[in-house]
């Protein structure tokens, strides 16, 4: 009575399981897939970078895991640092789908550090972008309202944006045939106080 899943095989001897769940479907017929493998998101993103599908976002030589200050940033593409985040906090689900209450993500320290490093990189003439990479066709990201828990991350995001760090969104589609790019776009700016 679980959800339909798309899995991939692994021949690693160190894993506890032989399969990885790549995507789930909240629909019983398994038509609407949502990718959940955050480890794969950077590989997918890199593929679309290298084949030129994301050329409005960044172009140039693609380097992975580039040191910047005290952090490792996912990509340096030409003159642009690109940090990819794959949010799984709110996955779309049909009405009536059970949801866990009170399981809120509250560890933003790494993301805040990355935003600061990206902001600081602008002084050297580099460009910097944070990409929200959704493994389904997500609505354009809207920052949550400040609530006491998320104030630090919202302040860091605003400060990075004011300094010139751009925020982009990439929506990918996963099905049993593979991964495809649905759309990508520069995100709307944060508004003050929201």
Model-derived regions: residue spans:
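Interdomain/boundary linker segments immediately adjacent to catalytic/signaling cores
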Residues: 1-40
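Short histidine-centered catalytic/ligand-binding loop motif
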Residues: 26-36, 93-107
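Acidic-basic catalytic patches of nuclease active cores, encompassing PD-(D/E)XK
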Residues: 27-64
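Conserved mixed alpha/beta catalytic, RNA-binding, or beta-rich assembly cores of soluble enzyme
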Residues: 49, 81, 106-116
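Charge/polar-rich, low-complexity and marginally structured segments
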Residues: 63-73, 108, 118
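Short, structured patches in soluble enzyme cores that scaffold and shape functional sites
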Residues: 66, 77, 84-86, 132-134, ...
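Conserved catalytic cores of phosphodiester-cleaving nucleases, focusing on short active-site segments
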Residues: 73-101, 118
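Non-catalytic C-terminal interaction segments of nucleic acid-processing enzymes
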Residues: 116, 122-194
């Amino acid at each position: 009575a679980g959800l339909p899943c798309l899995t991939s095989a692994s021949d690693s001897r160190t894993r506890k399981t032989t399969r990885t769940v790549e995507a789930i479907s909240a629909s019983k017929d398994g038509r609407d897939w949502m990718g959940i493998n955050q480890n794969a998101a950077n590989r997918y993103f890199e593929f679309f970078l290298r084949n030129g599908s994301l050329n409005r976002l960044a172009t140039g030589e693609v380097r992975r895991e580039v040191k910047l200050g005290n952090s490792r940033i996912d990509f340096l593409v030409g003159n642009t640092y690109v940090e990819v985040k794959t949010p799984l906090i709110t996955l779309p689900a049909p009405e009536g789908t059970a949801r866990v209450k009170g399981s809120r993500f509250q560890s933003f320290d790494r993301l805040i550090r990355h935003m600061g490093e990206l902001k600081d990189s602008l002084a050297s003439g580099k460009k910097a972008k944070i990409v929200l990479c959704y493994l389904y066709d997500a609505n354009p990201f809207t920052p949550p309202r400040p609530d006491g828990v998320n104030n630090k991350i919202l302040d860091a995001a605003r400060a990075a944006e004011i300094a010139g760090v751009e925020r982009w969104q990439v929506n990918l589609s996963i099905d049993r045939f593979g991964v495809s790019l649905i759309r990508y776009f520069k995100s709307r700016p944060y508004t003050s106080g929201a």
